[in-house]
Amino acid sequence: MPKRKSPENTEGKDGTKLTKQEPTRRSARLSAKPVPPKPESKPRKTSAKKEPGTKISRGAKGKKEEKQEAGEEGTAPSANGDTKVEEAQRTESIEKEGE
């Protein structure tokens, strides 16, 4: 992109074109106003640090993990998405035992 040419340097092949003036800085009226103070932000609450060995039940996330673990045991649907009758019966019996 070509640089702006100063109005003093209007000689040459682009001498007939007028160049834009540099934009002026803030007007005196705006610079006279004081900047409004920023509102203080509330300090964030810090959570209590837990020991690394303790486990916390996470609700829905925990259920997903249980399903993944069950899938590793061989009760998950087969690769193409179809379930076998034996696998369906196993999952039903596991769900009944859990209740």
UniProtKB/Swiss-Prot annotation:
Signal sequence, renumbered to the chain? none
Basic and acidic residues compositional bias: what residue ranges? 1-25, 39-53, 83-99
Q: Which GO annotations describe the biological process of this protein?
A: chromatin organization; positive regulation of transcription by RNA polymerase II; regulation of insulin secretion involved in cellular response to glucose stimulus; regulation of transcription by RNA polymerase II; transcription by RNA polymerase II
Keywords associated with the record: Chromatin regulator, DNA-binding, Nucleus, Phosphoprotein
Give residue numbers for the modification (Phosphothreonine): T10
Q: Quick one: where's region Disordered?
A: 1-99
Query: Is rRNA-binding given among the entry's keywords?
Result: no
The places in or outside the cell where this protein is found are:
Nucleus
The protein's predominant localisation is nucleus
The record's tissue-specificity note reads: Expressed in the brain, eye, prostate, thyroid, kidney, testis, glial cells and insulin-producing cells of the Langerhans pancreatic islets. In the brain, expressed in the lateral olfactory tract, anterior commissure, corpus callosum, internal capsule, fornix, stria medullans, optic tract, axon bundles, Purkinje cell layer and granular layer of the cerebellum. In retina, expressed in the nuclei of cells in the inner nuclear layer including amacrine, bipolar and horizontal neurons and in the nuclei of ganglion neurons. Detected at low levels in the liver.
Query: What changes when the gene is disrupted?
Result: Mice are viable and fertile. Mice have a mild diabetic phenotype and lower plasma glucagon levels. The overall shape of the islets, the location of the alpha cells in the mantle of the pancreatic islets or proliferation of pancreatic alpha cells are not affected.
What InterPro entries is this protein classified in? Answer: HMGN_fam
Residues found modified as Phosphoserine: S6, S78, S93
One Pfam match, given by its short name, reads HMG14_17
Single GO MF annotation: nucleosomal DNA binding
Family to which this protein belongs: Belongs to the HMGN family.
Q: What does this protein do?
A: Binds to nucleosomes, regulating chromatin structure and consequently, chromatin-dependent processes such as transcription, DNA replication and DNA repair. Affects both insulin and glucagon levels and modulates the expression of pancreatic genes involved in insulin secretion. Regulates the expression of the glucose transporter SLC2A2 by binding specifically to its promoter region and recruiting PDX1 and additional transcription factors.
Protein name, entry field: High mobility group nucleosome-binding domain-containing protein 3
Q: Which gene encodes it?
A: Hmgn3
